[in-house]
């Protein structure tokens, strides 16, 4: 049979399975592909193909992630599944696999477990907008009261971490029954995909967001002025539009008088484009790498924030020793390093390599930032951690 071509006409959503070890995340991922393959919406992918996830590097950190794709009537999905707990922590903090939504897998036989909690908390911290629950292994539970109890526990846990626990769809089923082709197993998978389709919101496309471009380089072109280059992160920039230069120094206003790509002049640059932007009346020395160009008023510079951070283990090339309060590494945001001081919470004496932790950072210079911004922590040019801004402190 010829391989069906995925139609890119449907809206695209990135999703992932999260939850405690052995609750059935990978079995569920396999079951989704096998059930959807029957209607031509996926290539059936077996458990062991997904479980042998390839290693990828994201900002100097090795993460094992399996990617599968499938489609429903309404959407095209890219789905990530990680083999180990540490891979999830790294994946969510680095944003290696951006998640527009998640499927939280909970074993009906065990109920919520420590990693269930940790994944819900991480999802909240890194800004996963919505999730749907799959209560797995219901074929192993004979008592309907027990099922109801587990569902209540899951809803309470979601509410505790700031998700709407009462509203979130909880689908009960068995990934194993679906893999075995049993009708009740398949029915639950179809119900789950309907819930994901309707409950996980459609993400805003990068071009529909406000304009932002991290500055990578600055040139002076005689007779024309100053050109900054970089990749447009979000939004669209048009000729004649007023923009702000934000970060490192006081915010300045300027006007875009030219957009150039591959030596051709354009009317506009949009998300994903590598462009040069000509700035009216801006001097070469007033702009530098590490600042951003942005729509006026859309982003502010900050130097104090709270972060969720994964610290590399020694085996991953990280530090060999823990760090303590007032540790001063470099924080790499977008295109530049800024020195900062780490302030640990009162109850935390130190952070060990291989741990994830929450702490406050004070930078020596402000950076254009918003919650959800990713960064690396570096020491002597090597990456020792990866983090995400969870809260800005003014």
UniProtKB/Swiss-Prot annotation:
Gene: tuf
Family: Belongs to the TRAFAC class translation factor GTPase superfamily. Classic translation factor GTPase family. EF-Tu/EF-1A subfamily.
Domain tr-type G: 10-204
Pfam families according to UniProt: GTP_EFTU (PF00009), GTP_EFTU_D2 (PF03144), GTP_EFTU_D3 (PF03143)
Keywords (A to Z) from UniProt: Cytoplasm, Elongation factor, GTP-binding, Hydrolase, Magnesium, Metal-binding, Nucleotide-binding, Protein biosynthesis
Protein name: Elongation factor Tu
UniProt cross-references to HAMAP family, sorted A to Z: EF_Tu_B (MF_00118_B)
Region (G3): 81-84
Function: GTP hydrolase that promotes the GTP-dependent binding of aminoacyl-tRNA to the A-site of ribosomes during protein biosynthesis.
Region (G4): 136-139
Region feature (G1): 19-26
Positions of region (G2): 60-64
This protein's GO CC annotations: cytoplasm
Catalysed reactions listed for this entry: GTP + H2O = GDP + phosphate + H(+)
Keyword Protein biosynthesis found: yes
E.C. number: 3.6.5.3
Subcellular location: Cytoplasm
GO function term, MF aspect, one: guanosine tetraphosphate binding
């Amino acid at each position: 049979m010829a391989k069906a071509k995925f139609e890119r006409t449907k809206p695209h959503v990135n999703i992932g399975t999260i939850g405690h070890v052995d609750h059935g995340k990978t079995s569920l991922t396999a079951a989704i592909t096998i059930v959807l393959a029957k209607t031509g919406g996926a290539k059936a992918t077996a458990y062991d193909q997904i479980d042998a996830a390839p290693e990828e590097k994201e900002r100097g950190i090795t993460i094992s992630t399996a990617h599968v794709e499938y489609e429903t009537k309404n959407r095209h999905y890219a789905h990530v599944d990680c083999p180990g707990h540490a891979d999830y922590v790294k994946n969510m903090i680095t944003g290696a696999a951006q998640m527009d939504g998640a499927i939280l897998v909970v074993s009906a036989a065990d109920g919520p477990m420590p990693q269930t909690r940790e994944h819900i908390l991480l999802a909240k911290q890194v800004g996963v907008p919505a999730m749907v629950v799959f209560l797995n292994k219901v074929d192993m539970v004979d008592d309907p009261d027990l099922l109801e109890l587990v569902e209540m526990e899951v809803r309470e846990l979601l509410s505790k971490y700031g998700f709407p626990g009462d509203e979130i769809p909880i689908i009960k089923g068995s990934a194993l029954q679906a893999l075995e082709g049993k009708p009740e197993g398949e029915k639950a998978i179809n119900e789950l995909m309907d819930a994901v389709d309707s409950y996980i919101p459609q993400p805003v496309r990068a071009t529909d967001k406000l304009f932002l471009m991290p500055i990578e380089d600055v040139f002076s072109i005689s007779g024309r002025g100053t050109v900054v280059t970089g990749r447009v992160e979000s939004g669209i920039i048009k000729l004649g539009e007023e923009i702000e230069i934000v970060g490192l120094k006081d915010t300045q206003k300027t006007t875009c008088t030219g957009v150039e790509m591959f030596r051709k002049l354009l009317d506009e640059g949009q998300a994903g484009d590598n462009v040069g932007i000509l700035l009216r009346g801006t001097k070469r020395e007033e702009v530098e790498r590490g600042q951003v160009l942005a729509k006026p008023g859309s982003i502010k510079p900050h130097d104090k924030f709270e972060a969720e951070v994964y610290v590399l283990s020694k085996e991953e090339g990280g530090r060999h020793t823990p760090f303590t309060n007032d540790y001063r590494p470099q924080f790499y945001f977008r295109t530049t390093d800024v020195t900062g001081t780490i302030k640990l919470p009162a109850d935390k004496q130190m952070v060990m390599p291989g741990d994830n932790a929450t702490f406050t950072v004070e930078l020596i210079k402000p950076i254009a930032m918003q919650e959800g911004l990713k960064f690396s922590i570096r020491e002597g040019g090597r990456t020792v951690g990866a983090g995400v801004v969870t809260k800005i402190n003014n």
